[in-house]
Structures are given as structure tokens and as C-alpha cells.
Amino acid sequence: MAEMWISMGPQHPMTHGLWTLKVKIDGETVVDTEPDLGYIHRGVEKICEARDFTQITTYCDRLCYASANTWSHAYIYAAEDLLEVEVPERAEYIRMIAVELQRIASHLMWLGAYCPDVGNLTGLVWCLRERELMMDLLQELGGSRMHYNFPRVGGVKRDLPIGFAMRCKAKLKLFLDRIQEYEALLDESTIFLVRTQGVGYAKAEEMINHGVSGPNVRAAGHNYDVRWAHPYSVYDELDWEPSVERPSIKGSDCYDRYRVRVEEMRQSALMILDGLDKMPGGADTHYQSGDPAIIGKAPARAAEGQTGFHHFEDSRGESMFYLAGGGEERGKHPYRVSCLLYTSDAADEGLGVDLG
């Protein structure tokens, strides 16, 4: 059969409107790709330079609707580094719970979109069913189903609702049972295995050279997770290790990348359960900083030349925020905001070109 080019887009692999992907195919085999990015460039960094440090959180929620909590937390940690703000331990545990719930919800969306692409519509329905459990818990924390605006400089918006720990534990234990159903559905499906095993081989060295991080590089056997390599929040107080696959000599395939995400969902659920048990409580614990310059108002200005930086483990890979203070001239607005927000996705797309 003659090779031909077809256009997939402008679209995102699972939604619409974000990029165009031209694909060269030979029958059912993709032999080359040409990605064209930048369809929804919004100038978020420049917008943030005209906002104070508290207002910026709202924009970060909208950087990725499937992982809103991740990006707002990544920014907050950079802002706290810049402003030299200390965060209560209870607030850090609450943040960890919110971020890991978001990771599970994001991975469920990934797997739910992946299943019908390889001929398993049931997987989509099941994943969306369990994603609702996570969305309900996130809505309890932030008051919204998508844009939570939950973290604050110095803590979080509110403490855990009454009875949240009990409800969260019950739903996570149910979810851990449902993960076994996913594995039975997919790992025992001949069609799923044929369409994922031996497809899209990539070695860890190739991924690292392309800047790929997150689950994809761990699926290739590279043991790098920001939460483990450079612990932040309370991750060094939890009982866990990064989920890493052991691929074949040819490298990781699509099946390995599915497996690592399933293990990460199980791992995140166990981390939350561990955190709920270890979280400090009582009248002397707080969910916000006790600094009167922080609570309920925009934080004080950052000195000119002062910088803040934080890198964060998003559900798709490593994300980073860099902030620079502007002193008296900029007031409570940052001089510069730089967010490497789509680094992992863009790197994955670049690797896809080579794999093609």
C-alpha cells in the first residue's frame, strides 16, 4: 500500500483545538509525524506580571483543566520561595492530598481516553465512573469541579471539611478494588494487548535526550520522580517509592506506559491514605500561615533581584515555575513569571516524531 499523509487536527489527542498533527501512514503503521503547536497561546506569563502574588493562582488553575491543582500548587511553592513564607505542616498534608487526588483524576482521564482508541469502550465508562469519586472529593476541598483556586500563599483556602477523612478513605478503598477490575479488563484482553505491546518502542536514553519526564520516562525504566529525587511538601514523610517499569531491551512500549500509570494511581491512593493517618490535628494545628502579613491579603512585595523557583511532579511530567521580584517599582506584582508548563507534553510530541 502506498504511503499517504493525513491530518489529525487541529486537535489534542483526546479533545480538540490545541494543535495539528500531520501523520504519514503505511496501512495502519505510522511512519512519520509533523506536529504544529501553539493554537491556544494566551500570554499567561505576561498577564501574571500585572497581577499580585495571590491573584496569579486563579490563572494557574486554567493552564491545564485536567490537572488544575497541580499547576496552582507548583506556582504557590515558587511564590513561597520568593517571599520566604513558612507553611504549617497540616497545610502541607492537605496540599499533598489535593494534588494526589488530582493525579488520580488526571490518569483516569488519560486511561479513559486511551481505551476507546484501542477498541475498548468499556474502559472509558469505568474510568469516568471512578473519576467522579475523585472529582467529588476535590469539589469538597475547593468548592468547584474544575478550577479549584485551592492553595494560598502560606497554606490552603480552607481546612478539611468535617468528615472528609472518613469519606475520602471509603472512596479510595473502593477505588483500589476498581483498579483490579481495570487490570482484569485490559490485561486479559487480546485486542488490547495486540494493540499496545510491541508498539511505539522508546528507550530511556532517547526520552531523556528529548527532555521527556514523568510517567513516560519511568515506563522506560528511568527512576526519576521530582517528589522522590527532590522532595517537597511532605513526600519525604510518606511510605512510597516511584513506580518504574522494567521494559524489554528494545525499550518501553505503549503497554508499559499504560502499566506505569495504573501503578501510579494505586500508589497515589495509598499515599493519601498514609497522609490522612499521619496528618497532625488538634487545636494547635493550622491550615494557613500565622503571619499577619500573609493572611487575607496580598503578600508583601519582593525585593528587586530576589527570585523564587520550584519544580513539581505533574501527572504528565516535571513542571517548573520561576518568579522574580521587582522591588518598589513593581509593588506587589512580580517582575517576571516564567512557567515551563507544557515541557513534558512538547517533549513527548518531539519524541513521537522520531518514533514515527
Q: Can you annotate each of these PLM segments?
A:
Residues 1-5, 90, 97-112, 250, ...:
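Intrinsically disordered terminal and processing segments
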Residues 2-26, 37-40, 226, 232-235, ...:
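Structured beta-strand/loop patches that form or line metal/cofactor-binding pockets in enzymes
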Residues 29-72:
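N-terminal cap/recognition module
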Residues 64, 69-184:
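Internal, well-ordered alpha/beta segment that forms a basic, Gly-enriched binding/recognition surface
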Residues 123, 127, 137-299:
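Intrinsically disordered, low-complexity regulatory segments
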Residues 342-349:
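Conserved small/polar residues in nucleotide/adenosyl-binding loops
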Residues 353-355:
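Hydrophobic alpha-helical segments, chiefly the membrane-spanning helices
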